[in-house]
Amino acid sequence: MSGEDVPHRAESSEARAAAVSDIQDLMRRKEEIEAEIKANYDVLESQKGIGMNEPLVDCEGYPRADVDLYQVRTARHNIICLQNDHKALMKQVEEALHQLHARDKEKQARDMAEAREEAMNRRLASNSPVLPQAFARVNSISPGSPASIAGLQVDDEIVEFGSVNTQNFQSVQNVGTVVQHSEGKPLNVTVIRRGEKHQLRLIPTRWAGKGLLGCNIIPLQR
């Protein structure tokens, strides 16, 4: 996960928390409206259970005397207004839930993509070999020399030269000593070339040129 993802994650978490808080506020308001609707229905129930549609006049067309007409009309009006408010509020709740689910789905997709990327990076890291540290570098090779025949190349970094390695290397004289004692004998040489490790077989031999190798080796500054 990159550093840029951290503020993005924090921003997403804050946005989700705000969305959840908004939904909770809407749900509280919904419960309040439903309680108010019930209270007004209770008023109608107290008036002979008159309900929302029963007539407020008697069979002769006169206002009913057995109920409080003002309370009934007020309760009916309140119920209609509150039901409209409830309907609009439920639409807000539905939209808020839809947005929250969409945000969660987007976050889930982003988390899955990040998890896949992290897993891929771990696989790449585990598959990438850890290259040993080199102690010297080849800076010149003569054509036709034992070093050239063995496959050494300019800029090869030497990790192991016979018995000389990073742990016991002190100076190029160590390499010279091994070469002098190995004339005509094969030496295992390990080099790093363009990020890859190569194993070579070098035989120090007298040839037309100078020395037994025909190459120049310089120590690496660490």
From Swiss-Prot:
Biological processes, Gene Ontology terms: negative regulation of insulin secretion; positive regulation of DNA-templated transcription; positive regulation of insulin secretion; proteasome regulatory particle assembly
Domain PDZ as annotated: residue spans: 108-194
Origin superkingdom: Eukaryota
One Gene Ontology cellular component: proteasome regulatory particle, base subcomplex
SUPFAM superfamilies associated with the record: PDZ domain-like (SSF50156)
GO molecular function: bHLH transcription factor binding; transcription coactivator activity
Keywords: Chaperone, Phosphoprotein
Positions of post-translational Phosphoserine modification: S128
Functional note: Acts as a chaperone during the assembly of the 26S proteasome, specifically of the base subcomplex of the PA700/19S regulatory complex (RC). During the base subcomplex assembly is part of an intermediate PSMD9:PSMC6:PSMC3 module, also known as modulator trimer complex; PSMD9 is released during the further base assembly process.
Oligomer status and interactors: Interacts with PSMC3. Part of a transient complex (modulator) containing PSMD9, PSMC6 and PSMC3 formed during the assembly of the 26S proteasome.
Similarity remark: Belongs to the proteasome subunit p27 family.
Name listed for the protein in its UniProt record: 26S proteasome non-ATPase regulatory subunit 9
Organism: Mus musculus (Mouse)
Organism placement in taxonomy: Eukaryota, Metazoa, Chordata, Craniata, Vertebrata
Gene behind the chain: Psmd9
